[in-house]
Amino acid sequence: EDELLPINFDNIPNAANVDEHLWEFSKTFDPENKYTIPHYWGTLGILYNTRLVDEKVDSWDILFNSKYSGQIIMENSVRDSFVPALKMSGYSINTDNTDELDEAEKILIEQRPMVQAYLLDSARDEMIAENAAIALVYSGEAPYATEYNDDLAYVVPKEGSNVWVDSWAVTKDCKNTENAEKAFEILCEKWKAMGN
C-alpha cells in the first residue's frame, strides 16, 4: 500500500491507445486509473489435444478425470491450481472460507496421482510435443501452442475462470520517472497497444 507514484498521463499521450475495456477492468484494483497503465490481459483455462481427448472439453472436471491419468499438466502455482477445484465446486476463486479451501485442497490431493507434472511456462511446449493430453495454462500460451500443433485447442470452462490484467506502474523509489514515462509512451504506441 502507498508504494506507487501517480502516473503523469500528460507525458504519455499514447496511453489513449489502450483499449477502454482494459481501463474499465483496471478500476477493480486502481479505481481512478491513477497508478497503473493496463498492458495485457488474459484468462486461465484448459489447453487440450483434440486427438488425445475424445470428449467435449467444457468443464474443469476433465482435469480430475482418471481416464487421463498421467496425461494432465497443472500449473506450478498454488493460486492457479486452486482455480479449477474451487470453480467446479461452485466457489469463488477469491474465497477465504476455510471450509471451501479445505474442500478444494482435498480435491487437489486426490488429483495428485493423476498429474504428470506441475509446470509453468514449459506446459505449452509439452502440449506441442504431445507429451500430455490436457494442461492448465494461461490464455497467452494458447495461440503459440496452436500455431505449432493443429490438434491443440483452448477453452475457458463453463464454470468460469479468472480474468487478469498485467499493468505498468512506477514505484515511489523510482529514480527516473521521466524515463519510465518515456518507456510507457513507447509501449503504448498504437500498433503495440492494439496487439494486446
Give the residues covered by each predicted segment.
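Short, hydrophobic alpha-helical packing/hinge segments within bilobed ligand-binding/sensory domains
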Residues: 60, 123-126, 142, 180, ...
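Short amphipathic alpha-helical coupling segments at ligand-binding clamshell hinges
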Residues: 59, 103, 107, 138, ...
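A bilobed periplasmic-binding-protein/Venus flytrap-type ligand-binding module shared by bacterial periplasmic
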Residues: 45-52, 86-88, 164-177, 195-196
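Periplasmic-binding protein-like
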Residues: 101-110, 148-172
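Bilobed periplasmic-binding protein-like "clamshell/Venus-flytrap" ligand-binding domains
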Residues: 73-74, 189-196
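Extracytoplasmic ligand-binding site segments that recognize negatively charged/polar headgroups
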Residues: 1-131
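Generic hydrophobic alpha-helical scaffold/packing signal
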Residues: 124, 128, 146, 171, ...
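A ligand-binding cleft/hinge motif common to bilobed small-molecule-binding domains
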Residues: 128, 134-151
